[in-house]
Amino acid sequence: MQTPADRQDRHVYPSHWEADIVLRDGGTARVRPITVDDADRLVSFYEQVSDESKYYRFFAPYPRLSAKDVHRFTHHDFVDRVGLAATIGGEFVATVRYDRIGPGGMPASAPADEAEVAFLVQDAHQGRGVASALLEHIAAVARERGIRRFAAEVLPANNKMIKVFTDAGYTQQRSFEDGVVRLEFDLEPTDRSVAVQRAREQRAEARSVRRLLTPGSVAVIGVGRAPGGVGRSVLGNLRDAGFTGRLYAVNQAYPDDLKEVDGVPAHRSVRDIDGPVDLAVVAVPAEQVPGVVTDCGEHGVQGLVVLAAGYAESGPDGRERQRELVRHARTYGMRIIGPNAFGVINTAAGVRLNASLAPEMPRPGRIGLFAQSGAIGIALLSRLHRRGGGVTGTTGVSTFVSSGNRADVSGNDVLQYWYDDTETDVVLMYLESIGNPRKFTRLSRRTAAAKPLVVVQSAGSAPQGHAVRATRLPHATVSALLRQAGVIRVDTITELVDAGLLLARQPLPAGPRVAILGNSESLGLLTYDRCLAEGLRPAPPLDLTTTATPADFHRALSQALADDTCDAVVVTAIPTIGEGAVGDGELAEALRSAAEGAHGKPVLVVHVELGGLAEALSAAGRTAPQPHVMAPGAFGGPRRPRTATPQSAADTPPAAPTARPAASPSAGSAVRPGAVPAAPGAARTPPAPVTEDVRPPAAQSGSRLIPAYPAAERAVRALAEAVKYAQWRRESVDPGKVPEYDDIDEKGAAELIGTLLERGDGLTLGTEETCALLGRYGIPVHRALPSPTPEAAVSAAADLGYPVALKATAPHLRHRADLGGVRLDLADEGQLRRAYTELTELFGPPGELRPVVQRMAPRGVDTVVRAVIDPAAGAVLSFGLAGAASQLLGDTAHRLIPVTDRDATSLVRSIRTAPLLFGWRGSTPVDTPALEELLLRVSRLVDDHPEVVAVTLEPVVVARHGVSVLGATVRLAPPPARDDLGPRTLPAY
């Protein structure tokens, strides 16, 4: 059977141009090439466009398309004539096309590099960012086809279209002639166009998540009539949480006369609901999900939470079901959390959404929580609840997402939402896998600059249900790159909660200086030792003795906080001894009172056998309880009644200064084909009015809670992470610059690379080619002359000049001086011949050893510099000392390319063996500025030429003055595709 691709004029159908996109309002659409089979769709699309929009497109009244027009707009060669369409529900909502032109605007073919571009967007979908997204995609297509410049003619009154072009960030020229505005712009991405694209990406993806977390109406599909079952549980959780919007129970098995389930309107299908549905929670078996998705899409549901299992986690068949699920949902513009998801929670008083399997609503607070695993998610909610104390506060949860297989909505999307969410101050994430490390690193850097981001990443293999890009980088390298991006990387969920509590409750420390005080000398010394081990600078502990009273603690803490030589205070406490024993509440109040004047310094408590103190510290100063909050037994143990005790108005905390709106899904949205339209001017299912939001502002005066830890190492580890993060925040304000070097020959290097790649798609360069390429970037490599015979070695030494080194370069001996395959400081021919004989007698004939002779470099510290382009993480620069010991210990530091001058300085000092470069134990310090310059030059080479996919300089001898590169290898290959520089797309399925 002939396909549309077979019937195109010249080229096969370019399926790689197909993409799913997120629109400005958070909905989705599909972009694809227009084919000859789209004639009817095109005509139907055009009939729904207003006369005004048609006039703007054709500069004259144009009520309908002629047969000739339809043929022209559906027949493309995908080179000189290209058309793309944005579709929702399989129908066109917008089109864009380009036609290659030559001088005078006449039709042309390659190598002409200019094209005329034109758009048409249905009026119902204008304002959703469709044209802006299509411009990104048609520009990428044009660049692929050798077009470097677009021209567009627009009527002056068509301000929307003019704005699409001018806001895109491309370098452009504008002229006015014969009543028409002519815009011309280069398609080469600029810093501004990339910034515009990423800002649009952030807004669109954040809104798509916001629509899932702030629905005005929720339908739970799969609610049984009898108690029990997943659907019934979720419905009960939504009711118990006090969801402020409309709830619906859906089950195709309901009898016709059933009107309600637990007081919630009941329907056999989503299509039967009289009114819009913003979010559907799908709790039916996997085999029933496709029909449910169709019903939801036809009704205009905006998003799905799919709890059903039986997808990619179950094997190849399930993986295909998962792909089809995502494709099916995106056809209707819906986003999915799941499948195999645990659900979502939003504690905002204007929403109060618990669309999850969590039995009770978490305490409202300022922590955003993401977990791919439902089991880990419930454990994290439980731990935050147990250690949060009180009933509301900074250490409660703002929003919670458990994405399951994260087939669609991922941690990247939720990061986009939390980045500018005013109700979230700290982000905690448990990641079993990272689908797009390059994007995650970029988003993490931006998020961490605004609020702390703490991550636990599983070090093992990704679960079966997760789509993960292949990476050659070790887990430790990925962790190092995340730290470079400002991520607080911890190893366990205990450390995740420990760090999260400190960051949510206390200010960031200004430095590493720590005061320690308490009523136990032993516990104080233990804390002191842990501070030293974590790289902090503790002062000698102040021992208040075991008879210390709350007043003694208050006085000592106040004095420590007032001391300018202190950046943070750790209070240690054990049970008091003797008749003067005091209650935990009194001590907690004394500490809290002293900490209120902390002047921006964090306070932590380490306690032994004082569980009551930890609870009292968390509960100190607490205010009115929030209705429908988590009962103490919510996650195991005895359950208590959920009824809140009435409080007087005086006990109620002030409302948060910027409460999140209850729901705003209607802004800018359009009705999908087949959807139920809302009444004119009506909002989508407004939630019940809310008079106050009990979630307190992050820094409310007098309400700061002090985190308590049952072990010194846990408290100090959390503090150390806060210190490093605070330092990163300060340094991120000025990340440094990428230096320019006058002796770099970028053009010459590009020409050489192009010539070399003509031999094949991937090759490792020979010695001369490597030296030639590196030389164009000011990186000289010491000559190493092959010496297959003693006479050849003597001749090479005469050419190079004594003293020389003789090295075996066989793979099993290369860079292994510890095995004895290197002889140094050979001052004359006699020494050289003796060394040659020793090597061949010890290791075998020259044919196996591959000996080379090299002139001796100045003595110094042997190091290794590497750069590699990883398909998932991007370009990475690595540095470490040479030798087996460093390799075994994994003592290597990493930075993302391009590297700035500050990055290079930090990179050199990041390895544990860095003291060897700076005069350790009386040795001579080496030339680290020259080493940093070498790192910067390698970074420039790889950044300027993505065809350079791997560089290794080993060894690099760093001497007292200068560096010597004694060995180098370079690998070239066609550059891997970079989706971070292309048009905005959702992950392909």
Where are these regions (language model features)?
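Long, contiguous binding/interaction regions
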Residues: 1-211, 215, 239
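Catalytic-core regions of core metabolic enzymes
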Residues: 188-989
